[in-house]
């Protein structure tokens, strides 16, 4: 049987409170956390799964549910935004690792490690608009996998979008 629960979040609740974790933990074999989409389609540009946020999500969850029941979902994809000179931005489009690396090559820029723990590419146009891409590679994913230590396991979204070299380590 599948157990599903939905509760509308209210302004006085943070991300953790729409679900009654303790009750869910008492009736499920495993609880799979969506440890991605911190920055999503309609948010400002930013990382999909910042490491500090993943640590906070893990800490809160295991305060409510035994770690051996928790699976941490991690992103194999990234997000790509166009940012205008006035600060407005496009919807964050999903992007595969391979596509991000192809754009970096085309734009002649090197991905850099972002303070959130992911990779970041920025390409600036003469009009001061820019492209911003936040994504994961093998190294950044291995750091995120370490965050899952003490949990039941990990899951990934979405197969086929990853840095293929990660499979040598899984």
Model regions: which residues?
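Substrate-binding surface in catalytic domains of secreted glycosidases
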Residues: 1-105
């Amino acid at each position: 049987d599948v157990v599903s629960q939905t509760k509308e979040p209210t302004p006085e609740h943070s991300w953790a409170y729409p679900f009654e974790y303790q009750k869910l933990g008492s009736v499920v074999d495993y609880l799979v956390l969506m440890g991605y989409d911190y920055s999503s389609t309609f948010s400002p540009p930013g990382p999909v799964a910042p490491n500090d946020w993943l640590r906070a999500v893990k800490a809160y969850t295991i305060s409510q549910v035994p770690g051996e029941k928790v699976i941490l979902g991690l992103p194999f994809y990234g997000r790509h935004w166009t940012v205008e000179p006035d600060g407005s931005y496009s919807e964050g489009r999903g992007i595969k690792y391979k596509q991000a690396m192809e754009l970096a090559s085309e734009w002649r820029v090197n991905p850099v490690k972002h303070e959130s723990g992911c990779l970041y590419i920025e390409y600036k146009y003469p009009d001061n608009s820019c492209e911003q891409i936040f994504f994961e590679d093998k190294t950044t994913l291995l750091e995120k996998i370490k965050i899952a230590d003490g949990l039941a396991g990990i899951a990934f979204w979405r197969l086929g979008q990853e840095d293929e070299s990660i499979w040598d380590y899984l």
